[in-house]
């Protein structure tokens, strides 16, 4: 998956 939460590069 690909999102912007802070801990995942998105």
Curated annotation (Swiss-Prot):
Modification sites for Pyrrolidone carboxylic acid: 1
GO molecular function annotations of the record: hormone activity
Compartment(s) of residence: Secreted
GO cellular component, one term: extracellular region
Primary localisation category: secreted
Family: Belongs to the GnRH family.
Role: Stimulates the secretion of gonadotropins.
Entry protein name: Gonadoliberin
Organism encoding this protein: Squalus acanthias
